Amino acid sequence: MSLVDQILGDGAVADLCLWKDKINSGITLVMATLFWFLLEFMEARLVPLLCSILLLLMLILFLWAKFGEVFFTRRPPTPEELNQPDSPLKALFSMMEGHLLMLYEIAYGKDNKTFLKTILYVAIIYNIGSYISLLTILYICLVCSMTIPVVYMQFQELIDSFMGKVSEEKNNLLEVFKQVVSKIPRAPKVE
């Protein structure tokens, strides 16, 4: 089992990132590119677009619920059927609640090291976000997650040998740096 398989696992996301199902991977990449292009270059606004999609979905669901027996063999699920203890929506809200609780515990200040790390990461994300939009960052992450594993799988030996050489060079530079730093005279301690 290769390193990429160990990292990604063997689920649907791994199949998508490794292009095992070329049609779904291609559709995902093309749709993400079109969505990014629409919002970034065509200057469409996200909230009106989401509201339009929501209105369209509500209209389709309404027509399906009222006239579903005529056009479809299956009726949509009722609200009572969706209100199940194992509902995906409840799982999503539970996960969001867990993340918010974790942030609250960090902000409460019991672990100062974790608090400072969180502040540092948020500041880094803030600085990156002031130059690049969130949508562009998410698009770059998607494209990288769909291309880097495939390129690594194809050129694994070449990349591993190159990274080995880079690691050796880094270790050599660290040794030279330690030698240079050791030659710098130390100031006497003042009491």
UniProtKB/Swiss-Prot annotation:
Primary location group: endoplasmic reticulum
Transmembrane annotation, as ranges: 23-43, 47-67, 122-142
GO annotation, biological process: response to bacterium
Sequence ranges assigned to domain Reticulon in this UniProt record: 13-191
Residues of the signal peptide: none
Top-level lineage group: Eukaryota
InterPro entries linked: Reticulon (IPR003388), Reticulon-like (IPR045064)
Mode of membrane association: Multi-pass membrane protein
GO cellular component, one term: endoplasmic reticulum membrane
Record's keyword terms, sorted: Endoplasmic reticulum, Membrane, Transmembrane, Transmembrane helix
Compartments (UniProt record): Endoplasmic reticulum membrane
Pfam families: Reticulon (PF02453)
Record-linked PANTHER family: RETICULON, RETICULON-LIKE PROTEIN B15
Name of the molecule in the record: Reticulon-like protein B15
Protein's organism: Arabidopsis thaliana (Mouse-ear cress)
Organism phylogeny: Eukaryota, Viridiplantae, Streptophyta, Embryophyta, Tracheophyta
Gene name for this UniProt entry: RTNLB15
